[in-house]
A protein has these predicted regions:
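Short amphipathic alpha-helix that is part of the acyltransferase structural core
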Residues: 1-23, 27-28, 105-107, 118-151
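A conserved beta-strand-loop-helix scaffold within acyl/acetyltransferase catalytic domains
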Residues: 7-19, 24, 29-42, 145-199
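A structural microfeature
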Residues: 29-30, 103-106, 171-172, 248
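A short, internal acetyl-CoA/4′-phosphopantetheine-binding micro-motif in the GNAT/acyltransferase core
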Residues: 39-50, 78-79, 196-204, 234
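Conserved acetyl-CoA-binding loop-helix of GNAT-fold acetyltransferases
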Residues: 50-65, 196-199, 205-218, 222, ...
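Acyl-donor-binding surface of acyltransferase catalytic domains
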Residues: 59-126, 253-255
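Short hairpin/turn module used for nucleic-acid contact or packing/dimerization
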Residues: 224-258
């Protein structure tokens, strides 16, 4: 991953984290970064992996969290601006430490130079009309609540809400962000994101949301974004239909303490 030191510190909420490290011959060979009960990051340099160093760090983190009254540890955490879980390649390590998976997600990317909306077989517009939301925010929040109540807090600015409507009724919706500052920015420069993509249950399975995301992806390309980033999804195969590809899979791990 290509990421600058300053961006790393910013994304990590550095000032609210606790840092653990392991040294050999006065050189750091492993470290972990923890915020409250969330292990934001744990790294062991390859030559030192498999020697119990990571296990010792986990033990130190458990004691630290327990001493502060926490009864569990989690990998990543959805509030993390870096990894929100344990990446799949490292999950076996966490299992050995007693972590249990309570879910999994994928993160996806599409290089926009390769994207061509007119080459896709889309059918949502057979029944839906697409455009930027220009109505009452309470109406969009009502539709969002039918999909995921926790998302309503993010729908606060109508200027970045894109919707599909059927006979004037909100059927699908998503948030649209350009020039995002995240862990992909240093590598890809201009990153855009469709987020909180959802379809009201009674309008599902009609291709409405798929065309909506495709249209938003085209918009991001028109705005000069280099890539479109899908953050935290459980429907990777659905996004693959319009060209997105998974580059990272993560497990949400939990370990009870005490």
């Amino acid at each position: 991953m290509e990421i600058s030191y300053n961006r790393f510190c910013d994304l990590l909420h550095k000032d609210s984290c606790v840092y653990f490290e392991s040294k050999e011959d006065n050189e750091i060979c492993a470290f972990a970064i923890v915020e409250d009960f969330a292990i934001r990051l744990i790294c062991v340099i390859p030559p030192k992996q498999g020697h119990g160093i990571g296990t010792k760090l986990i033990s130190d983190i458990e004691k630290h969290a327990g001493d502060r009254g926490f009864d569990k540890l989690i990998t990543g955490g959805v509030s993390s601006r870096l990894f929100i879980g344990a990446i799949s390649e490292s999950w076996r390590f966490f299992e050995k430490q007693g972590f249990v998976s309570v879910g999994k997600c994928d993160e996806m990317i599409l290089k926009l130079v390769d994207f061509q909306l007119d080459k896709l077989a889309l059918h949502g517009s057979d029944i839906a009309e697409y455009g930027w939301f220009d109505g009452n925010l309470e109406d969009i929040r009502s539709a969002v609540s039918l999909v995921d109540e926790s998302w309503t807090q993010y729908f606060i600015n109508s200027e970045n809400i894109y919707v599909a409507k059927v006979n004037g009724e909100i059927a699908s919706f998503c948030l649209v962000d350009i020039n995002c500052q995240n862990y992909l920015t240093d590598k890809y420069r201009k990153v855009g994101m469709p987020g909180c993509v959802g379809t009201v249950p009674k309008f599902r399975n009609n291709g409405i949301a798929l065309e909506m995301v495709a249209r938003v992806t085209e918009y991001l390309k028109d705005q000069g974004m280099d890539v479109s980033f899908i953050f935290f999804t459980g429907v990777a195969k659905w996004y693959e239909k319009i060209g997105y590809r998974t580059f990272l899979s993560e497990y949400f791990g939990v370990k009870q303490l005490g």
